[in-house]
Every structure is written in structure tokens, then in C-alpha cells.
From Swiss-Prot:
Homodimer. Interacts with VP1. Interacts with VP2. Interacts with NSP2; this interaction leads to up-regulation of NSP5 hyperphosphorylation and formation of virus factories. Interacts with NSP6. Participates in the selective exclusion of host proteins from stress granules (SG) and P bodies (PB). Also participates in the sequestration of these remodeled organelles in viral factories. It comes from Rotavirus A (strain RVA/Human/Japan/K8/1977/G1P3A[9]). Its cofactor is Mg(2+). GO terms for biological process: viral genome replication. Residues 153-166 have a biased composition (Acidic residues). Plays an essential role in the viral genome replication. Participates, together with NSP2, in the formation of viral factories (viroplasms), which are large inclusions in the host cytoplasm where replication intermediates are assembled and viral RNA replication takes place. Orchestrates the recruitment of viroplasmic proteins such as capsid proteins to these factories. Participates in the selective exclusion of host proteins from stress granules (SG) and P bodies (PB). Also participates in the sequestration of these remodeled organelles in viral factories. The modification Phosphoserine is found at residues 67, 154, 156, 164, 166. It comes from the Viruses. Belongs to the rotavirus NSP5 family. One of its GO terms (molecular function) is nucleotide binding. One of its GO terms (cellular component) is host cell cytoplasm. Disulfide bonds: none annotated. This is Non-structural protein 5. Its main location: host cell.
């Protein structure tokens, strides 16, 4: 099995952040302009902290939720994505905050030179031979433990005791008294062997 991958040139991603007005740039892949500009509002963290600390926990309602506070709304706005009719892709990868006086523009350009070429060749052959050996070594027979055989009689109706029998485990008037005691002795031997093995 052989797998060859030719990666002469991986996809190159170039990202540039401009602080001035957004300029229309053309992507080498789609031919569409990508870019955006937006006025950012810088929050006053000190005023927000004073505002939240001045309120009691009982007075905090839905209007004071995390999505409405100035810090989170600023974060949502700074990470927003805007597209227009000419734009194919627009994204914001910058984590730094912008001052309120400047206009931010993030531009991402994707260029694929040769792409990735994959050539895979798979050669496999499977051969299965099924030869069963019927000869067993004598050591296998010696190592195997032999348990006493228990023969089950088909005529179980003949083992039913009559009314004169006692319930103490002794069979006095059984039709097959000798077979009963032999079977009971075998069962005892099997039970003792199992206990020893455990």
C-alpha cells in the first residue's frame, strides 16, 4: 500500500489590518472585493463598573443582562461581520480594541497557487488457507480435566416416589434404587470437583 501526497505549496493566508479608510481589494480566488469599515464605540469601563455596583441584586433586571451592557455590546460590535453585494467574505480576526476616533478595516486575502495534489495507489492481496489439523497431541488429552459423566434418563416418570417415601433424601421404594444412588454419588463428585477447581 502506497500513499503519496504532493504538497509543493500549501494554501497561503495573508491577513492585514488597516487603521485608515477601507480600500476595495480584490481576492485572487473569487475576484470579489472583501473588506468592511465600521465606526467603533469605546466603552467607559469605569462608568459601567460604578453603575453596576450602585444597583442592588434585586434591582437588576433583563435590561441589565450581559447582552445589553456596554462592554459586551462593544465586544459584539467589534467582532461583527458585515457584507455587501460586492463582498464574498468578510471577517474580523483582530482582538485589539479600536479607539473611537479611528475607522477599522480588516481584510483577509486567500491565495491558492497550486493547491494540493493527491495520488493514492492501493495494491493488496489476501490469501487465506484453511487447513484443519485433526491430530491432537497427547499432552492436550493429559492436561484436560475429565469430569464424571452424568447420564440423563429419558424415563423420568419411573423416578417418582410413592406415598411411603420420606422427604429426607433417601429413596426406599424407588423402581431404580441403584441408579438413583449412583447418580447421586456422581453429582456429589462433580460438585466436589467444581469446588476444588474454584
Amino acid at each position: 500500500m502506497s500513499l503519496s501526497i504532493d504538497v509543493t505549496s500549501l494554501p497561503s493566508i495573508s491577513s492585514s489590518i488597516y487603521k485608515n479608510e477601507s480600500s476595495s481589494t480584490t481576492s485572487t480566488l473569487s475576484g470579489k472585493s472583501i473588506g468592511r469599515s465600521e465606526q467603533y464605540i469605546s466603552p467607559d469601563a469605569e462608568a459601567f463598573s460604578k453603575y453596576m455596583l450602585s444597583k442592588s441584586p434585586e434591582d437588576i433586571g433583563p435590561s441589565d443582562s450581559a447582552s445589553n451592557d456596554p462592554l459586551t455590546s462593544f465586544s459584539n460590535r467589534s467582532n461583527a461581520v458585515k457584507t455587501n453585494a460586492d463582498a464574498g467574505v468578510s471577517m474580523d480576526s483582530s482582538t485589539q480594541s479600536r479607539p473611537s476616533s479611528n475607522v477599522g478595516c480588516d481584510q483577509v486575502d486567500f491565495s491558492f497557487n497550486k493547491g494540493i495534489k493527491v495520488s493514492a495507489n492501493l495494491d493488496s492481496s489476501v490469501s487465506i488457507s484453511t487447513n484443519v489439523k485433526k491430530e491432537k497431541s497427547k499432552n492436550d488429552h493429559r492436561s484436560r480435566k475429565h469430569y464424571p459423566k452424568i447420564e440423563a434418563e429419558s424415563d423420568s416418570d419411573d423416578y417418582v416416589l410413592d406415598d411411603s417415601d420420606s422427604d429426607d433424601g433417601k429413596c426406599k421404594n424407588c423402581k431404580y434404587k441403584r441408579k438413583y444412588f449412583a447418580l447421586r454419588m456422581r453429582m456429589k463428585r462433580v460438585a466436589m470437583q467444581l469446588i476444588e477447581d474454584l
